[in-house]
Amino acid sequence: MTSVLIIENDRDSGPGRLLDWLDERGITPAVVRAWDGEPVPASVDGYAALILLGGGMLPDEDERSPWLPAERALLRAAHGRVPVLGICLGAQLLAHTFGGEVQGKYGQPEKGVTSLTVLPAAKDDVLLAGLPSTVLAVESHQDQITRLPDDAVLLMSSERCPNQMLRIGQSWGVQFHPEVEADRVRGWNPERLRSLGFDPDAVVADAERHAAELDKTWSAVVGRFLSLVG
């Protein structure tokens, strides 16, 4: 049976809707909870794709998150061999590992439903071809990619974060969270949201109001990624 390796970097950043989309296609998730001490594999042998999830650390905060060197090594081993999807921290790991730059608490934070601009390069991308010029996604970050690797293609941007989605070969990184549903947004700490300048009630209401549109968009995009798995 086809299996996809998923690295979980934070107890609060689980795979969410990814598990449903995998199940719909008969693909088995192999989730490694690196934050809980589970060892990160040295290779993608036996796996058809690699997905790296989010987390509150920077991609090189090795003292805080001692599994990160192994995760970066795994990413290098997987790149060019199997399709890779990096989400939030996962996208930052992709950029950092291949020569880009990531800065902590850079610019203005993004939380909740956010409008993204789909850039011209996306029209030829196997995951994004046919999308409208703007789409909505759930965001939850303060850190961001400030310089792309030289061979990266920029696919999406937002007002507060220019580097929202990149591709290097068959490795994609998204700063946003396609896997997050309104249920998870409801669980976000309201005081934390207020401290970042957001109205917690408005953030939840937006996630609920746009739930169907978000699911339609990202189930299709992630579905295209999973169609590469084989």
Feature names for model-found ranges:
Residues 19-85:
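Flexible gly/pro-rich beta->alpha loop and the following alpha-helix that scaffold active-site loops
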Residues 98-183:
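Pocket-forming structural segment of enzyme catalytic cores
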Residues 7-9, 34, 89:
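Cofactor-binding loop segments of dinucleotide-utilizing enzymes, especially the Rossmann-like FAD-
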Residues 180-230:
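Acyltransferase
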Residues 12-17:
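Short N-terminal binding/cap micro-motifs at the start of the first secondary-structure element
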Residues 61-64, 96, 106:
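Conserved catalytic-core motifs of eukaryotic protein kinase domains, centered on the activation segment
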Residues 1-5:
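Extreme N-terminal starter segment of soluble prokaryotic enzymes
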Residues 78-101:
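Catalytic nucleophile loop
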